[in-house]
Amino acid sequence: MSSKQVARAATKAAKPSNGTRNASRLAQQVERVAALSYQARATRKQTQLRRSIFAVVAAGGLATASQFYINNGNFVRQGHAEAPEKEENPLVFEESRKKKSNSLEENRDMISSQHHQVKRSWEKPGVYAWGSNSGRVVAPDSDERVIKTPRRIPYFDGMLLRDIKLDRNFGAAIDERGDLIQWGVGYAADVKTPVRTLEGKDLTSLSISKDRILGLSKNGNVYSIPASAEDQANDPQPQESSWVPFWSGKSKIAYRNITPQNLSRGEKISAVSSGLEHALLLTSKGRVFSAASASDVFPSRGQLGVPGLTWLTRPEGAFDQPHEITTLRGFNIAKVACGDHHSLALDSEGRVFAWGDNASGQLGFDYNPESMIVDAPSLLPLQKLYSGKSQTPKITHVAAGGENSYITVDATRVASPKDDGLDPRTQLQIGRVTADTFAFGSGIRGALANSRWTHVQSTPSKIPSLSGLFEYDEKTNSTVPIRLQHLSVGSTHAAAVMQNITYTDASQHTSNDDTNWGADIVFWGGNEHYQLGTGKRNNMSEPTYLQPLDMEAEVKRARKSSGAKEEHRFHITPRAYATLGDGRRRWVEQRVECGRHCTAVYSGTG
């Protein structure tokens, strides 16, 4: 085959047929239609985009014009910060009370209100007082009739006192040197600051009556001083020896020395207690003397304890001369106490003798309206209080005031025929001591502290909240009874300091969490003059706690501690050798004194 023939054959083979040409034309038409459809859709989307942009621009312009109109011609609004609304009950999280930036003492203050109270009592010693101020005793520089809550008496700021006694009309105190300080309307109506009166006698304790002050000196002398400055100036002033040899002169004020003259060798007066008209003098050898203690009235309700002794039958000599209570001879009397018109004496064996007025049952004997006076010491029946309880009672303390009497009792558990000797629980109870407190007398103002308002209570009534208390002692690893450290009784109210475990050894050398704490103290009874210190006027028939004395400092402490208000109670500072605010080192403790319609807590020493 020639080359020309081959070329024609190849050309013929490459030439498409009619079916192939038709399919090609159809495909080209489809592609052309698809391209036209895509261009149409793109055109529509572009048109929609232009319309959207126009709408947004129009809306923005309208908003700008509105903002321009609202903001007084300014396109930019002037913003002001607004505080968020406060929640009704916001959730407060307590922060850590110990902060590295705080000192050791600041951290301890935040940890414990009790530690703060103890520290403040050392830094700022003085006197807090409250109650009736009709005689300007509680607040000498104020004309307020009552002081509802504890308030400091500025004169005593920084001072330590040996003793203090308060009547609604006059007050008396002994400073650290043993000098007598007096104030109040009953002393001088125009004097609004305490005055030092009897000096140089080294007084250690005080007792007051209707219008006189009895001061006991360190050497055992008993001085009877008029409460009134006028009487001090007008009554006979005794001769006094001077430190200059062979030189003597009259005292600056009038007073009487009523120390018994027939004391034995080495015997001296160790304690004095007084009512409105009488006083009891206890000697170091357990003897008891009684004497009249008011200037204008002689005791007539048997409170002297000497049968038949009256103003008409009194022996020759001074009206206030002491008389030995011979009925108590042979009993070693350890403590004495006086109410307004009655007397109590406790001997070393735990027996109590009572005499005087029994109109409210304050002697603990059955009430007899035909014979309300007992003029000789009589033994208080005690066994019936523990009848059938397998306990042996022993009275450990007596206190009295107004028309009330109080006793504290240690009751020891003993074996009885009813006990099962094989019961180990019974064996553990043998020898267990329970400390109880009883009250008797007038309860109409709540002084019985038993939740009742009894007019006459002749049988001693147990005070539930001050009886049968125990705590764990870490030093002895045992449970011990909580007794009363001190009981102060006023005319219608009382206060008790508990003998619970206290601690005052926290120092720079102990741990950061080591804090001091004081003793519990409670108040109860009449409150008509706000003498309980609660800030309210209702009487209390149950012992109650008070707020801390220095509430201003307590509020500041609470703000640093938790940032919120905290509720704490007053704890009284126990005896300790401490550094005071002025740098002095002294034995000091806080003491409570209930008087006639008023109360005081003071920094005591000696």
Model-derived features with residue positions:
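N-terminal mitochondrial targeting presequence
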Residues: 1-88
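Short glycine/serine- and acidic-residue-enriched loop/turn motifs that recur at repeat junctions
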Residues: 70-123, 127-149, 181-199, 223-256, ...
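Short coil/turn segments that connect the beta-strands within blades of beta-propeller domains
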Residues: 124-125, 168-169, 177-178, 210-211, ...
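Conserved core positions of repeat-based scaffolds
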Residues: 129, 170-173, 182, 212-215, ...
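Blade-loop segments of beta-propeller domains
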Residues: 148-170, 185-211
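Surface loop/turn motifs at the tips and blade-to-blade linkers of beta-strand repeat domains
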Residues: 153-156, 195-200, 205, 261-264, ...
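Loop/turn position at the start of each blade in beta-propeller repeats
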Residues: 159, 167, 193, 201, ...
